[in-house]
Every structure is written in C-alpha cells, then in structure tokens.
UniProtKB/Swiss-Prot annotation:
Stated family: Belongs to the IAP family.
Subunit record text: Binds to caspase-9.
Zinc finger regions, RING-type: 189-224
Protein name per the record: Baculoviral IAP repeat-containing protein 8
UniProt xrefs under InterPro entries: BIR_rpt (IPR001370), BIRC2-3-like_UBA (IPR048875), IAP (IPR050784), XIAP/BIRC8_UBA (IPR042579), Znf_RING (IPR001841), Znf_RING/FYVE/PHD (IPR013083)
PANTHER family for the chain: BACULOVIRAL IAP REPEAT-CONTAINING PROTEIN 8, INHIBITOR OF APOPTOSIS
An annotated GO BP: apoptotic process
Residues the record lists as binding Zn(2+): C39, C42, H59, C66
A single GO molecular function term of this UniProt record: ubiquitin protein ligase activity
Gene (name only): BIRC8
Keywords: Apoptosis, Cytoplasm, Metal-binding, Zinc, Zinc-finger
Record localization: Cytoplasm
Taxonomic source organism: Gorilla gorilla gorilla
A Pfam short name: zf-C3HC4_3
GO cellular component terms listed in the entry, alphabetical order: cytoplasm; nucleus
Length: 236
C-alpha cells in the first residue's frame, strides 16, 4: 500500500467541502475530529476548510518548510504562493473588467516577482499593472525579463509627459539608463550591499537580504516586523 492509499483510507466517509483525494495527494490524513487533518511529514495541522480551497496552496501557505511539499511542488511554487499573499493587498479591484478577465490577469501578474521588483524601484503599482495587462492582452503572455518591463515603463512615462503639455509643474525625467542602474542596485542585499537578495521574510513579504545576512536577523530591516519564517527565493 502506497503512502497516498494509506492516507486516503483515513478519510473514510469524508463529508466535508474539500476533496479527500486532493487532501491525500497533498500529504494529509484525517485525525478523526471533524474536518481536522495533519501532514504525515511535517505534522502541520489544518481545519475549518472552505469550499474550493486548494490543499497544496494551504500546505504551502502555512507550512512552507515541509520537505514533502518541497519535493512534490518545488521552491518556485512555494515562493509564488507567498509572493502572491504579500502583493494581494495592493490590488485595486475595478468594476469595469469582467470577473473572468480580472481572474486571468491576477493569476498571471501577482505570482510574478518582477511586479514586486518594479514597485521597489519606484514605479507606481497602477502603471505596472496597466502595462502588464496590455502586454497580456496583446501578446497572450506576461513579461519575461525585468529589463524589458522597465524599458516599457520608462517609455510609457515619457509618452505621458509629452502628451501632458498643459502641465503647470515640471516632472522629473527618468533617463533609460537610470532604472537599469537602479535595477542592479536593487538586486543587492541591503545589509552587506555585496551579495544578491535571496530570502523573503514571512509574514511582511519583504525581499531585502542575501541568505547569509538573513540568518543573522530576527526582524525585517525594512519594516522592523518580527520574522516568523525565512523563505529562500531564486531570482533570475
């Protein structure tokens, strides 16, 4: 009997909203108390399931250090779950879009680390979201590199400045070289300013230190929030 089969048996006549086969595949078994379940590997427990909740996503959300989860889904999946959580608060919903289009765009944009990087470089969230939406609608896919995204954002800013001929105040002009220079600086650890950033702090979501410096801090150097978990990320 495989691990999956053994875990599945524990659910018996499971009558709750989440599919028991999906729960078993995600490494969970039922403990016989209402809808409470537990991971066979990390021991993490979950309960109070809501309809359409994904067991893998909940596993990654609450127990990102689980080795079984890491083996089955990989670093990128776990990183995307936590980056999505940290960015969802910045989403401005618009009633002009259909629900299906809004879902498609949010599913494509928010797991993308380039969004957070562009925000950290000083670009406005609404401008980034708008240009990513246009990219998806015209080409069917999102940006592949941060450099191309930055170049298009700078170009859009220049077009906006030229069209607003009646402005009464001068706008600071960003040269094409400046964002690229800042991009290189933004990739550096904000503590040692030597190695590349490689760790995202949970729950605040800030990505500001290399692996070595992250091991030496208990609070986020950006917002001073207590760090509950340190998740390794791999930037391209």
């Amino acid at each position: 009997m495989t691990g999956y089969e053994a875990w599945l048996i524990t659910f018996g006549t499971w009558m709750y909203s989440v599919n028991k086969e999906q729960l078993a595949r995600a490494g969970f078994y039922a403990i016989g108390q209402e809808d409470k379940i537990q991971c066979f590997h990390c021991g993490g427990g979950l309960a109070n399931w809501k309809p359409k909740e994904d067991p893998w996503e909940q596993h990654a959300k609450w127990y990102p250090g689980c080795k079984y989860l890491l083996e089955e889904k990989g670093h990128e999946y776990i990183n995307n779950i936590h980056l999505t959580r940290s960015l969802e608060g910045a989403l401005v919903q618009t009633t002009k879009k259909t629900p299906s289009l809004t879902k498609r765009i949010s599913d494509t944009i928010f797991p993308n680390p380039m969004l957070q990087e562009a925000i950290r470089m000083g670009f406005d969230f609404k401008d980034i979201k708008k240009i990513m939406e246009e990219k998806i609608q015209t080409s069917g896919s999102n940006y592949k590199t941060l450099e191309v995204l930055v170049a298009d954002l700078v170009s859009a800013q220049k077009d906006t400045t030229e069209n607003e001929s009646n402005q009464t105040s001068l706008q600071r002009e960003i040269s094409p070289e400046e964002p690229l220079r800042r991009l290189q600086e933004e990739k550096l650890c904000k503590i040692c300013m030597d190695r590349h950033i490689a760790v995202v702090f949970i729950p605040c979501g800030h990505l500001v230190t290399c692996k070595q410096c992250a091991e030496a801090v208990d609070r986020c150097p950006m917002c001073n929030a207590v760090i509950d978990f340190k998740q390794r990320v791999f930037m391209s």
